[in-house]
Structure formats: C-alpha cells, structure tokens
Amino acid sequence: MPASPFALLGDLLANSAGVLLLWLLAASSVLVWNWRWAVTSTVSLLLVTSSLLSALHSPLALVTASQWLAALLAGLLLWQAGSFSPIPTAPAGNWLIRLCGLGFLLAAWQAVSPSISLPLLTQAETDLLCWIGLCGLVLLSLSNAPVQTGSGLLLLTAPLQSLAALLAPASGAAVLVGMAQILLALACAGRALAQQLPPASPQPPHLSLPATQRPAPRW
C-alpha cells in the first residue's frame, strides 16, 4: 500500500530528534510572546501531529486531509484577525516567569506520565500530545488577547484530534473535531475584530422648550 503524501513529513520527524523538536516548538508558543509566532507554531503542531499519525498508524487519507484543512483554515482566521488588530498584546510576565512555569509543569508531568496512556498510542506519542495540550492550557491561562487565546484552544484540541482519527476513523468524528477547531478560531477572530469597533457616540439629549419660550411663528 503506497504511503500517504501526508505521511512524508511524519516520516521525517518520527524519531527522537523530531519529537524533541516538537516539544520545543510547543514550549516556544508560550515563551515567545508574539501572536504571529503563536499562530504559526500552533498550526505547525497540528499539521505535524496529523502527519505523524498518518506515518505511524496509517489512518484514512481523507481523515488526514480534513485535519490539515481544518488547521489551515483555523490558522488563517486567527492570522487575519491579528493582522487587522492594531492593539499590541501585553506580555504575561517576562519570559523567565513563563519558563519557570513550563519547567514546573514539565516536572509534574514527568512524575505522572508513566500512569497515563492513550488508546492505540505509544507512550512517546501520548507524552507529546499531552505536552502540546498542556502548553495550550498555559497559553490560554496567561493570555487575555483573543488571537493567543484561540491558539491555546487549538493546542488543547490536539490530543482529541488524534484520538478521533484513530478510534473512530469512519464515523466522521475527526471532521467534527475539525469543525470545532474552525468555530473556535472564528469565535476568537470575531472577538479580536469586535475589540476594534469604535464606541458608539452618545446621542445628545433632545431638549423641548416650554410653550411660553417657543418663538412665535412669523407670518
């Protein structure tokens, strides 16, 4: 059976160096406080995890294509919203505080990870997907900017995206997850654009003069 074209990228990263690169990419979405990098890293992680799944487990090519389409559309919505939003996002603390937070989270995860497993996934795949989801949770908790909030929400859906493709490949669950990703991105993009709407100017009160003060009509 010929390999899916989506699996080519997964074949390149299906090794220790590739997995380490993905761990660092997920962490950088929190450390580098920039909405462009948040969107870029989020879409890259969704595409690469889908490709890894295609290379290691060979799901239906149509399922992988729907995952790619959903990730690209969601990323495009967030990117366009960030481009039209002139208000800069204030960083949530400095990078050292965020690094310490990620380090604490990593230590806690290493303590509990041997007891956590996902169906049909190896321990390395489980660790990677859960780490991506945890980085999304940190990004979501630190950000009050809609674009970065959307990136965090999309990262949180990475484990669900993979499980839907493996556990129910023919049920359309992966398509539903993709639709949910697009709706999340659309909601965050709409919120970002709504923040730029000018406030409605108050209408001046209508003053009515008493009958005694009204000017007499001119004949």
What residue ranges belong to the model's regions?
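Alpha-helical transmembrane segments of multi-pass membrane proteins predominantly involved
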Residues: M1-W219
